């Protein structure tokens, strides 16, 4: 059937997104200039921020790059901000872009080692409580040094691999679609498959929360951490020590929640690996190990050594994070024999869409700076007592991060806090404490929904989610106990532990104030 040009344009616009979503974006693009020119630039700026948060919240309807990018282009075109201001924001945060481009790609070439580690964990530990704890701890440790997206991508790869193996055995057809259960005729096999799905769901959620628990602790754990660390003038060790008064209690309580959920089988947790599935997977692993030749074993050893280099380089701050990632790419590809251009290109596919989206974030941040959108909120917070400021920053960050992207929220708030310091409104010591409150507030409560954590969103939109019946609602439900405990313990840490423990560490010589002075631009 022939369609009109108008229908064709509407169908092409934002692809398979729902019509109501397309019309909402078109309405935003029509209303924004009218409000900017005829009502108030300040109101138009806030409308842009709310609309951009809306595109992030609707990430499952349409990837936010396209609608958010259209809104950002229009904002620059009508004069909400200038191309120069956008370029300046991008230049200020070049380190973060390099982290996403090179570090994620670098870890892609270490996937063999990470797959090997998680496979051995899954098959060698029989106790579900111990296994869940191991996955959570392993994800937390890896996310402290690697990118959380990459860690969750590896766990997804392992889970999809195992699911595929068992599905083929259960259906007696290795060539059938793993999304099709109609070939599994035995009721017992179907029951086993459902239990296996529940088992994988719980492991994936533990691993996802583990990336948040570890990611908050170091400056490379999450992209926004690097922005906050740069603004405060902290290196790897400084950042880790500064966060410890809040992150250590949260880590301990998070792991305790993991144990309790599995022990009492709450919130959809507690399913064990069916013995039949374990046998199938163990047999497969034995065959794979027997086929592994010396060349492949050497590759695993090389990747382990590169992992050691990565940890040392980050801990001693031997180079900028992105450059360390580039060194990982060069070392891993050189010594593992990956020299084909197309094989190299695959490593960059995961990170580049998010890198482009982050660049759009910076355009919206430029609007916020140009129009002074957050100034009233910051002034309200800064009028309260210094101790109340910390809790308010933590809560405001947490609330926004649970519905929006935490990179965006963290960037906005640290810029505003830095501006207050440069104007002499707050002291250097208070600015540093606020930086801790912003970082923890941005990272911890954001596990509430997939919108807040990039790793959770990646899991929800992955090929694994429909296989194990992991929906948006189920993710929110399974994350709820973690959200309550991590947010609550984080708030108590900011309120009661942060100031005294930080002062004690300064007196003990464990940390010192960085050499940044009021009036110096954030770019330096």
Swiss-Prot record:
InterPro entries linked: Na+/H+_antiporter_NhaB
A cellular component annotation (GO) from this entry: plasma membrane
UniProt keyword terms in alphabetical order: Antiport, Cell inner membrane, Cell membrane, Ion transport, Membrane, Sodium, Sodium transport, Transmembrane, Transmembrane helix, Transport
GO terms, molecular function: sodium:proton antiporter activity
Catalyzed reactions per annotation: 2 Na(+)(in) + 3 H(+)(out) = 2 Na(+)(out) + 3 H(+)(in)
Keyword Membrane among UniProt keywords: yes
Compartment(s) of residence: Cell inner membrane
Pfam short name (any one): NhaB
Membrane-spanning ranges: 23-43, 45-65, 98-118, 136-156, 203-223, 239-259, 304-324, 325-345, 358-378, 392-412, 420-440, 448-468, 479-499
Domain of life, per lineage: Bacteria
Membrane topology label: Multi-pass membrane protein
The UniProt record lists the keyword tRNA-binding: no
Family designation: Belongs to the NhaB Na(+)/H(+) (TC 2.A.34) antiporter family.
Known role: Na(+)/H(+) antiporter that extrudes sodium in exchange for external protons.
Protein name in UniProt: Na(+)/H(+) antiporter NhaB
